[in-house]
Amino acid sequence: MSLDHHQFHQANSRNSKPYISYGIPFWRACAHHAKALNSHRIYIVASRSLSRSQALEDLKNALGLIHIVGEYNGIAQHTPWEQVFGLLRDLRQTQADLIITLGGGSVTDGVKLARLLAANNVTTLEQADSLLSHCEPGKPKPSDETVQPASIPVINVPTTLSGAEFTRAAGATNTQSDHKKRIIIHQSMYADIVVLDPELSLGTPARFWFSTGIRAVDHFVEGIYGNMATTMVQGDNSGSDQLIIEKDIQASLGALLVALLHTKDDWQNCDARLRQMLALKDCPRAGHNGVGASHGIGHQLGPFGVGHGETSCIILPCVLKYNWSHGDARLRAKLQLITDVFWGNAVLTKLLVDRGLHPQDTDPGDVIAAYISALGMPNSLAKYGIHEAQFHQIAENAMEDVCTQVNPVELDKNKVVEILYMAA
């Protein structure tokens, strides 16, 4: 097969995985990498929409039907645990030696967790709770004896901008009892290869493309806090290292913001789509550097019917305004780096000025809200039927999420409720 124009390199020089593959059709890239991995028992996990598409047929034909041992189609948003276990059982029965995913963050997260559970012979949610208690954010890295590393190779082919394909984190929701979303981190959950094909994403509905784009914006924006740097970032954590991280976050955020607008103007612009996809490779660096209540509150909105990316559209501007109003000088200086990205770019500046904003009287929440509005995305909980009566339960769940607990402005249940009222 011709590999002219194929690009293949590490996503990030600081980690051995994943590698990025792009420049040729995804099905050709997957077949090439499957052969290089000497895989003969390939398992495909596809989103519900892609499971009915020509794209899946193209992938199967390229791989050779004889090498495909199973399929799992349609993991719901926010990744229900029952679907993770359904996938886990299938992986065991088929003895897959390679997994290929087609879809967004829920599919990617489901495979991450199933791979890790498979390596540790987990069969029940109770066993998973015990194992995964060692893999929660902020905890020391567990030994390989405590948590066996995931071992089945995986190729992710993303069709949204969630950025999950580049991270070692995953989340799943208990839909049978408390409806809480649990976040897990383990080094072995990195993908082996991420295949990027902007043409494949043309079939992704605009709502999902732009909302997951804002989710990626959320990763970069909260990553600027630096509140997780001492526990999560690999490096010397010196002041100079932190400055480099901040510059990288600003550069990737700016590239993503501008390219998203190009897609808004021209849906078929595959060059802009590829720029967005490539910008996401720095999401792990941002997420390991900082996180906050937009993620923590957002994790708890899934069971109420809010899509993964749409949680950021609604909550991120409100959390930013709260943190700006209640933060100290150091935090304000960090948040100013976000507004600098907007006011330092001619395209983004025009967007803000056209909406009546000016540098001297805007905060980070204002500029992010204006940008989300320009993309035509939802901006209130009421649009999802979430009202005051549910705020206290959401806030209670959010306060058990580590992302809320480490927000740079200390929060409690009542303060989270205040943020929810801002998003009402």
Curated annotation (Swiss-Prot):
It holds the Pfam family ADH_Fe_C. Induction: Expression correlates with fuminisins production. The keyword NAD applies. GO terms for cellular component: mitochondrion. GO terms for biological process: fumonisin biosynthetic process. InterPro entries: ADH_Fe/GldA, ADH_Fe_C, Alcohol_dehydrogenase_Fe. This is Dehydrogenase FUM7. It comes from Gibberella moniliformis (strain M3125 / FGSC 7600).
